[in-house]
Regions:
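Short amphipathic alpha-helical interaction segments
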Residues: 50-68
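Short, hydrophobic, well-ordered secondary-structure elements
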Residues: 130-162
Length: 266
């Protein structure tokens, strides 16, 4: 049984349970035993020695949701001994997760898989930091999620600036290197933007129309949030902002590598 499809099926089940909760005449009651019924068709097709292993994968997924605070053992509002495990209840945070249409930021494994499929050339450093960011977001460690997201974004920008530097011809290349080499990322980006603006109009149409959105808009927004998180500003971070940044990151990375490919083309 494929883990990704199993997780998707479990999420769909919890979504269905949430919809039942909207009916005042019904009270969702979930037991761990729902897994056997949910995967009855898949399990029945397996040899006997594989059935327990398949159910174990499903149980692991449920416990992962418990670990991030989306579920808790027991029934809501009950405190009697018989009302705890194997009963499970969707938490308020879980309701937020399962009700969301874009599920990927709440699924670290699925998020990285989708990112790699969309941007197969993504480098290991960027992938490592964005993976940390998604994992931290799911634990509600918003400071860590914001900082690691910012590092991933910065690394992509450094990759682009390097490709652009190699694309430039002298004397522009030498002058640009003197202004940007070994500087803070804010300085490097400022010099890059100033220089790149002169070349943006010659980009292919599909790259030309969005460069300010992806480079000036998304990169700067992520960088400023990272600065707020990385310094003792006391500013409260928004989970919705981190979620939105994680949503757009794959498109941002795709644009960076498309632009890099253009700059490296003969």
């Amino acid at each position: 049984m494929d883990r990704a499809s199993a997780k998707s099926k479990i999420v769909s089940y919890f979504k269905q349970q949430l919809s039942l909760g909207n009916d005042p005449s019904r009270r969702p009651q979930i037991q761990m035993g729902f897994l056997r019924e949910l995967f009855q068709q898949e399990i029945s097709a397996l040899p006997a020695w594989q059935k327990d292993a398949a159910l174990s994968v499903a149980r692991e997924i449920v416990h992962e949701f418990m670990n991030i605070g989306a579920l808790y053992p027991g029934q809501r509002g009950q405190v009697h001994g018989s009302d705890f495990y194997p009963w499970i209840t969707i938490t308020e945070y879980g309701k937020e997760i399962f009700a969301n249409e874009d599920w990927l930021p709440y699924d670290p494994e699925g998020y990285l898989k989708a990112l790699t499929e969309k941007v197969p050339e993504i480098d290991d450093v960027t992938r490592a930091y964005i993976g940390e960011s998604v994992a931290a977001f799911n634990r509600r460690h918003l400071l860590s999620a914001t900082i690691t997201l910012g590092v991933a974004s910065e690394n992509l920008m450094l990759i682009l600036i390097e490709a652009y530097t190699n694309w430039l011809k002298d004397p522009r290349k030498t002058k640009f290197q003197k202004r940007s080499k070994d500087r803070w990322i804010a300085t490097q980006y400022r010099e890059f933007k100033q220089e790149f603006t002169m070349d943006a109009k010659s980009l292919p149409k599909e790259l030309q129309s969005d460069w300010e959105i992806y480079l000036d808009g998304i990169f700067n927004f992520v960088r400023l949030n990272r600065n707020d998180a990385g310094h003792p500003t006391g500013k409260e971070l928004s989970a919705k902002v981190v979620y939105a940044n994680l949503q757009i990151f794959a498109d941002y990375a795709r644009y960076i590598f498309d632009l890099k490919k253009y700059l490296q083309s003969p």
